[in-house]
Structures are given as C-alpha cells and as structure tokens.
Amino acid sequence: MVFRIASSPYTHNQRQTSRIMLLVLLAAVPGIAAQLWFFGWGTLVQILLASVSALLAEALVLKLRKQSVAATLKDNSALLTGLLLAVSIPPLAPWWMVVLGTVFAVIIAKQLYGGLGQNPFNPAMIGYVVLLISFPVQMTSWLPPHEIAVNIPGFIDAIQVIFSGHTASGGDMNTLRLGIDGISQATPLDTFKTSVRAGHSVEQIMQYPIYSGILAGVGWQWVNLAWLAGGVWLLWQKAIRWHIPLSFLVTLALCATLGWLFSPETLAAPQIHLLSGATMLGAFFILTDPVTASTTNRGRLIFGALAGLLVWMIRSFGGYPDGVAFAVLLANITVPLIDYYTRPRVYGHRKG
C-alpha cells in the first residue's frame, strides 16, 4: 500500500500563513504571562534567545538554498517554533540548550525536509525531545511557583543563572529550586510519579505544597488555564479547528478518570492530568499544527484521541513525567495512515 499526504504542501498562501502564525503568537500571550508570573523572568529570556536563534538559523539555511530570506521569515513560522520550544523548557535552563534545541528544530526538523509545509514532524517538539533525551537533568529542573518558592530570582538573577549557572550572590539551581518545605521542587506530574515509585500513598502526595492549588498543582493550574484561554480565542478567530483539542482533552480525561477509578493509589486524578504539564499548550498550540496533523475532520478526531491516549500512557507508565512531546511525534507518524483511511470518497466512486 502506498501512503500519500494528499494536500502537501499545506501552506500555499503566504499572507494567510503569516496571519495564522501571528494569531497563534498573539494567543500565546496569556500563557506566557502566566509562566512569567509563576516562574519568573527566565521564561522571557528563553523566548528572546529562541526567537533570535530561530530567525538566524532559518535565514542561514535560506541563504544557502538561495531562497528569499525576507519573504520566508515574514511567515512567522520560525518565530512560532522558537516560542513553543522556549515555553516548554525550564525557565533557567542554560542558554546554549535553548539555542541548540531551536537550531536543531529549524534546520534539521524543518528546513532539511524542504521547509514549511513539507516537514512530517512538529519541529518544536523534535527540538524539545532532542534536549530531553540529551540533557534530562537540566530539562526537568523546573523552579517552584513563586507561591511556594524560598528564593525568587529577579530579572538580573535569571540572566546570570542562564548564562553563567549562578547568581551574583553565589546562588545556583539547587538553591533556587528549594520550596517552602526545604525540598527541591519538580512539576506536579514529576512529583507524583517519583513519589508513587517511592511507595508514598496518594493521600500523602496530595499534602505536598506543590498540590496546594484549588484544582491541581499550584501555579501550573493557572498556567494551563491561561493557555486554554488563548486556545479558545484561536477557536473564536477560526485559526484552528475544534476537532483535535476536543478529542485530545476528552480522551485524556476519560483515560485518566478510568485509570484513577481502578487504581486510585497509583494513578493521578483527571484534574491533575488536565491542568498540569503541557496539556493545554499541547492541545491548542502544538497538536493543531496544520502541517503535521491530520487533514480530514474524522482524521483530526482520531489524531487528537490517539495523542490523548499516548499522553496518559506515558505519564502513567512511562519513564518521563510529561508525555506531550513524545505523544505529538508518535501521532505525527500515523498521519499518512489516518488520512489515507479517512479521506472523503470521490463522488460517484465505487470500490471495484
């Protein structure tokens, strides 16, 4: 059987592409603001580094390929790739990591396939996974939200840690990651997985400061709600379609609910899955990438549901605390197959 992506390349109108990318960038403002509020200025520094790296990397490749640099950069796709990677990594990760991940995403995962519209995998998630596999410690060193943090780095401190590894007063990531309980903090998903494996009960885990939020992990619930708000705005602007976010979130919630009902002592409750990690960012800003997602309505529902199932399985049974990036890439692999079996039948066509 030969699989074909019938509508590739997906982006034919550069002005339309530029407008959609700009809408996505604007929709990201609430999520970025929430991450800045809870995790400090490091997020902004990472966004600036990633944006500059993405534009320079794209310009370099276009120059080598003798293509128009200015016209292509105006589509804002490189900028969006850098932004999505920057908000996915810890805010005080070393500067060279975000540069390396962004350059890899733009050059290897996008331009080597032929540029926008030709890449089969989401470039930002390729860059993220490369960094996660290569530097797992740095990529899981998140700061505690400011509500439970002992040391809150300012703008200058954030720059110093990102570029030198420590603040002017000698503080490093180990001291900055301390929570009010004197324990180095991780994300709610990472904390849950580590604690369950250590033999702690769910009742004990829920007493940790990181779970003192109203619905889920402190800070993270509001970050996810902010990304949700941006995603709803994208739907209202008709920049994305509802099929993928809805099927992804419904499937994730359903799997999490069933798992929690059958094994409440080892699996996280559905609200933790929905409002922790990169759930809403993935649902509305990453999975909906028109280049790497399914192109039919039925296909989008299947694609989103598959990603939701994979996220829950990786979070619950895998070796990584948050499975959004891996789920996105694994779902990307299935897109030609999904599109092949869900493409509309041509009028008058009969199976011979």
Curated annotation (Swiss-Prot):
| Enzyme Commission code | 7.-.-.-
Q: Record's Gene Ontology CC terms?
A: plasma membrane
Q: How does it sit in the membrane?
A: Multi-pass membrane protein
Cellular localization per UniProt: Cell inner membrane
Q: Major place of localization?
A: membrane
Q: Which InterPro entries match?
A: NqrB/RnfD, RnfD_bac
Q: What family, per the record? A: Belongs to the NqrB/RnfD family.
PANTHER family in UniProt: ELECTRON TRANSPORT COMPLEX PROTEIN RNFD, ION-TRANSLOCATING OXIDOREDUCTASE COMPLEX SUBUNIT D
Q: How does it assemble?
A: The complex is composed of six subunits: RsxA, RsxB, RsxC, RsxD, RsxE and RsxG.
Supply the name of the protein.
Answer: Ion-translocating oxidoreductase complex subunit D
As recorded in Swiss-Prot or TrEMBL, the protein's gene is named rsxD
